[in-house]
């Protein structure tokens, strides 16, 4: 899980979602998981 000021999809399988007001990226590749904060 990467914590970044700006989250961007890194591949075509990445999905940008919102959970509890936080923007997150979920993906098949665990290295691509990101959250904003």
From Swiss-Prot:
GO molecular function: structural constituent of ribosome
Gene Ontology biological process terms, A to Z: translation
Pfam families: Ribosomal_L36 (PF00444)
Gene Ontology CC: one annotated term: cytoplasm
InterPro entries named among the record's database cross-references: Ribosomal_bL36 (IPR000473), Ribosomal_bL36_sp (IPR035977)
PROSITE patterns per record: RIBOSOMAL_L36
Top-rank taxon: Bacteria
Protein's UniProt keywords contain Ribosomal protein: yes
Key words, A-Z: Ribonucleoprotein, Ribosomal protein
The family this protein is said to belong to: Belongs to the bacterial ribosomal protein bL36 family.
Protein name listed in UniProt: Large ribosomal subunit protein bL36
Organism of origin: Listeria monocytogenes serovar 1/2a (strain ATCC BAA-679 / EGD-e)
Source lineage: Bacteria, Bacillati, Bacillota, Bacilli, Bacillales
Gene: rpmJ
């Amino acid at each position: 899980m990467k914590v970044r000021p700006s989250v961007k999809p890194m591949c075509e399988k990445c999905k940008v979602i919102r959970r509890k007001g936080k923007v997150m990226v979920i993906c098949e590749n665990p290295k691509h998981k990101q959250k904003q904060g």
